[in-house]
Amino acid sequence: MKIRVIAGLASVALAAIALTSCGDDEPSPKGGGGDNDKPAAARSLTVTVDESQLTYENLEIVLSNGATYKYENVPFGTVTVTVEDFPRSVEELERLKLPNGMTDIHQNLYLQPLLMVCALNELNYDRDVARAMIDYVGKGVKSQSRDGELIHYPGEGVSTADPTEWSQAKQYSRFDKVRSYFEGATSGNNYTPATKPYVMKLELNNYSYTADKDCVQVWLTSTQLASKKPLQVWKYDSDGDGSYDYFWTSTFRSLLHSLAEY
């Protein structure tokens, strides 16, 4: 596959993320992530999205079979997202103070990796609450596609999914290490940054875009991994007008892979 950046400058191109599922194995709390006790009442935490370091360019992808795909004005560069503290419930996800007049977390591509990591962090404390948060961020719903066919969004049925998915994630992961996607979270501070708000850097590059225009790969940095982790983000356009209805993230296991017990 050949990728060529053609030109630069224009409006934002949004994308989105899907999700797989959990089974019935009970995760063992690993500790960390701030206070293990939940707040007495649901908080309204602030999240921010800084896209000022992005540039926008035209992109052409040429596959080995000669097929060509062209993108106009796609974002390249780094996005900085922050959260005041780790949300601990679906209610706190619903009460988030969102930037730029947004009313729902699924209206912005770059919030999806941030909030999925926050949802996975809850696995350290309460499996059922974590499942609900994962399902909420992952947009676990059914909807009608443009051609009228019923489509299934990954993330639906998190609580009833194949236990194998959950067992594999648990076996090869340490749930407390998922916080290592935030800057400054290391083993020395129990994978919890010392300062708030918690900061996450997201990268978009030539490898973020493929022949599937409904998918973008966002790259995350972990203090525990030698290389950046790609995460698929999906977008849903109900009427094909290029204006995306919402975004969601796919597979939660990809964020947990390689964060092992050793």
Question: Predicted regions: what is each one?
Answer:
Residues 31-56:
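Post-signal peptide N-terminal segment of mature Sec-exported envelope proteins
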Residues 18-21:
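C-terminal motif of bacterial Sec signal peptides marking the signal peptidase cleavage site
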Residues 217-262:
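Short beta-strand edge/turn micro-motifs at domain boundaries
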Residues 10-14:
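Core hydrophobic alpha-helical transmembrane segments of single-pass membrane proteins
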Residues 41-43, 55-181:
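Core segments of small alpha/beta cavity-forming domains
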Residues 1-9:
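Bacterial N-terminal signal peptides that target proteins for export
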Residues 23-26:
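Bacterial signal peptide processing site
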Residues 149-222:
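Surface-exposed, charged secondary-structure patches
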